[in-house]
């Protein structure tokens, strides 16, 4: 990874992804074992898991029989007293990063992974308190998802990812028929700023009544390459992390480039910017980087990612959470409990992200704005949120992109308040879209501001604006 403008978020050192593809023929029994219905996918207990009052399921759904592509999912249901709760599909980006690794394990999921992968602790602000949350590793080759066609790893792109994700949903609802017609939402962050609206468009156009799509939500996501570049470079300059000369050079070289496939001139400009920025966490400007040595590779030592806040580190910040999930998901007993790598044939290290998929990404449309316009007109609930300390897809980028839609404002920019009557961020309501910022959060909002993120999620599900100062707020 040479620049912060391409990976969202950056992958760890490249896993032996080709080995993954070559061993997938041996892994395929995972899909077969889960084919008998959702009861076969029930997780009895994860290693090191505390007692819980909700059920979990995980397994494989085959999305392309001919190619042998199977996607891995993890479902964390809401407690019985909260049912029937909505179903929410969560997607992380990259492209090439695992929703199980990030969304489920260090953001909004039910658990946080302990140091050295020793076990799990319950996340007080887990989103499955109010919804049934479905995490999907996509495309094939990410996390535990796999393909029997090795070339798939080198030919992934937006279009196939969206269609495979739709095929996953159609089959998943057959395995879990009690979720048919349930209120359904798609949510995600980062490069899922593409995945979420693209999949939502497919679901909407399908007219499939089983998938009762009500809306989508995107956090710190790529929306429109031109406006995202403008807002990102402005944020860098305003925060003093690039020089005047580099700011001008970035604008000259990059503004009309693809965010995912930049030109050599843009690459060169972002290399200069990266050198000027130094060893900081661009995904959360004011938090520390992980300084634990690693045997994986030198590139993993300089990863700049947001990290987690943990119950045993009250008030402090742990910048090394990725190391913990890597250790945990490489445990054979964990894989067995998850119904992953059923045959034990996986002879490569599970990683949070795939460098190979990321660096060989194919089609990546430069703008999601046409999809936004289509789905706004269709009446879907659409929310966009942004942590205001993210320097990769910063709030300024999101505001420029949303501004390009030209929507009428129904409620002007105002501070919203959390349950402690502290300013949680700011919001503006447009005709057909709600924009929310989260104060002090980075690229992964539920990671740095978990309590405020849960309030945001609750308001989204209820279709209510972010609370003002006089509004009584209850956190689930």
Curated annotation (Swiss-Prot):
Alphabetic keyword roster: Carboxypeptidase, Disulfide bond, Glycoprotein, Hydrolase, Protease, Secreted, Signal, Zymogen
Reaction it catalyzes: Preferential release of a C-terminal arginine or lysine residue
Modified residues (Blocked amino end (Thr)): 314
Principal location: secreted
Signal peptide coordinates: 1-34
The keyword Lyase belongs to this UniProt entry's keyword annotation: no
EC numbers for this chain: 3.4.16.6
Keyword match Ion transport: no
Function: May be involved in the degradation of small peptides (2-5 residues) or in the degradation of storage proteins in the embryo.
Family: Belongs to the peptidase S10 family.
Name of the protein in its database record: Serine carboxypeptidase 2
Gene, per the UniProt record: CBP2
């Amino acid at each position: 990874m040479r620049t912060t403008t391409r990976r969202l978020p950056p992958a760890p050192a490249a896993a032996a992804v080709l080995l993954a593809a070559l061993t997938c023929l041996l892994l395929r029994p995972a899909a077969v074992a889960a084919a008998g219905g959702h009861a076969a996918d029930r997780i009895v207990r994860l290693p090191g898991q505390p007692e819980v009052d909700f059920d979990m399921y995980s397994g494989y759904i085959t999305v392309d029989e001919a190619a042998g592509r199977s996607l891995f999912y993890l479902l964390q249901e809401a407690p019985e007293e909260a049912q029937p709760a909505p179903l929410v599909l969560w997607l992380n980006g990259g492209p090439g990063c695992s929703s199980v690794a990030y969304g489920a394990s260090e953001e909004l999921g039910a658990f946080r992974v302990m140091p050295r992968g020793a076990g799990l602790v319950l996340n007080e602000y887990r989103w499955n308190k109010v919804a049934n949350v479905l995490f999907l590793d996509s495309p094939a080759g990410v996390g535990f998802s796999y393909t029997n066609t090795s070339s798939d790893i080198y030919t992934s792109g937006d279009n196939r990812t969206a269609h495979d994700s739709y095929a996953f949903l159609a089959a998943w609802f057959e395995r879990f028929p009690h979720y048919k017609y349930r209120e359904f939402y798609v949510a995600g962050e980062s490069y899922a700023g593409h995945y979420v609206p693209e999949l939502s468009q497919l679901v909407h156009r399908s007219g499939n009544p089983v998938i009762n799509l009500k809306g989508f939500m995107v956090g710190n996501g790529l929306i429109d390459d031109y406006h995202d570049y403008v807002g990102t470079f402005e944020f860098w300059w305003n925060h003093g992390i690039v020089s005047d000369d580099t700011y001008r050079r970035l604008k000259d070289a990059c503004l009309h480039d693809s965010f995912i496939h930049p030109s050599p001139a843009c690459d060169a400009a972002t290399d200069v910017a990266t050198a000027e920025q130094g060893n900081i966490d661009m995904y959360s400007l004011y938090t520390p980087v992980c300084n634990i040595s690693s045997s994986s590779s030198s590139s993993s030592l300089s990863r700049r990612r947001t990290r987690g806040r943990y119950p045993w580190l009250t008030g402090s910040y742990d910048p090394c959470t990725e190391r913990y999930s890597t250790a945990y998901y490489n445990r054979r007993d964990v894989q067995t409990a998850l119904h992953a790598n059923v045959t034990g044939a996986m002879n490569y290290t599970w990683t949070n992200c795939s460098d190979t998929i990321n660096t060989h990404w194919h089609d990546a449309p430069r703008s999601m704005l046409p999809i936004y316009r289509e789905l706004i007109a269709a009446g879907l609930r659409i929310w966009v949120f942004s942590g205001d300390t993210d320097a990769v897809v910063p709030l300024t980028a999101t505001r420029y992109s949303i501004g390009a839609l030209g929507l009428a404002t129904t409620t002007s920019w105002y501070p919203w308040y959390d349950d402690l009557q502290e300013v949680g961020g700011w919001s503006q309501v447009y005709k057909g879209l709600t924009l929310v910022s989260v104060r002090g959060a980075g690229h992964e909002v539920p990671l740095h501001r978990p309590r405020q993120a849960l309030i945001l999620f609750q308001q989204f599900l209820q279709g209510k604006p972010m609370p003002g100062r006089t509004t009584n707020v209850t956190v689930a």
